[in-house]
């Protein structure tokens, strides 16, 4: 199966739980936030820096690596871990979301999806089987099935079509997957914001007996209460001994709300994307460091933060770097944002272990005036 997941502690007031995910490249404590390294790199960071910030598992992207440099080249290099000098676990998403959001002129059928590269316009065809083979060539610890992510808003008819196709694709991916190999394969639950579709999707994928389950099709524009409601529909239907992964979600408030409902794994480009646009997480909410009021603020980005940036540099200095277009400005905001989320996940794990998750959640959200 490639992985082993154990629940170590269940919170007494919520569905939050402390877990241990054992993979061929190391052990990961959950709940966990996974930094995103789309192109086999967490933007502006070395692998050692990412690990020193507390990351134990990262995410990379099948669509992008398939197009450039190519999965066969990565295989020749000894696999993705060796290629990018990351010795911890790697999860690769299937590329389905990118095909539907980035690739122009795509054609969808039950067989798979034909698309043109957003890089050079070349024509490609993804099937459920091919996507599994590509991820096995990359050497991922955890691979994701090809799915069809319905947009929001989406009609019930279109959502049903996408959900049923995702289930059929999942069965084909499951059959193609080498379950005796080192790569574990997760199914992806779809269904948009429709309860019956979400529940049908979950039950069908559980019947296929995947090692873990992604919850997809959320954080695509729907109001957050709808996302939280969808989690409440599906999580009770997932076996307790399987990890639950909320895909593409990673703001601090969503971490708390997802974990409270039983989510174990999160990923999101938000910390690195915000950093590139001059914004950072703080304990009172989002701060846009690029904005003029920070030009003469000689305090840290977030008082009390212990990251490298906050220990050495002021808001005024980081503001200056960002305004001047210096790469160091983006590096410093990236370091801070990744530290913020990784340290928050660590604090949440400690709180669950000590059965005080609910109070930590209430305190954090009460202080957060401007959620990301």
UniProtKB/Swiss-Prot annotation:
GO molecular function, one term: tRNA-guanosine(34) queuine transglycosylase activity
Binding annotation for Zn(2+): 305, 307, 310, 336
Biological processes annotated in GO: queuosine biosynthetic process; tRNA wobble guanine modification; tRNA-guanine transglycosylation
Cofactor entry: Zn(2+)
Catalytic activity: 7-aminomethyl-7-carbaguanine + guanosine(34) in tRNA = 7-aminomethyl-7-carbaguanosine(34) in tRNA + guanine
GO cellular component, one term: cytosol
Residues spanning the membrane: none
Cofactor binding mode and count: Binds 1 zinc ion per subunit.
Biological pathway: tRNA modification; tRNA-queuosine biosynthesis
Documented EC number(s): 2.4.2.29
Pfam families: TGT
Record note on quaternary structure: Homodimer. Within each dimer, one monomer is responsible for RNA recognition and catalysis, while the other monomer binds to the replacement base PreQ1.
Function recorded in the entry: Catalyzes the base-exchange of a guanine (G) residue with the queuine precursor 7-aminomethyl-7-deazaguanine (PreQ1) at position 34 (anticodon wobble position) in tRNAs with GU(N) anticodons (tRNA-Asp, -Asn, -His and -Tyr). Catalysis occurs through a double-displacement mechanism. The nucleophile active site attacks the C1' of nucleotide 34 to detach the guanine base from the RNA, forming a covalent enzyme-RNA intermediate. The proton acceptor active site deprotonates the incoming PreQ1, allowing a nucleophilic attack on the C1' of the ribose to form the product.
Family named by the database record: Belongs to the queuine tRNA-ribosyltransferase family.
Protein name: Queuine tRNA-ribosyltransferase
Organism: Desulforudis audaxviator (strain MP104C)
Gene name, Swiss-Prot/TrEMBL: tgt
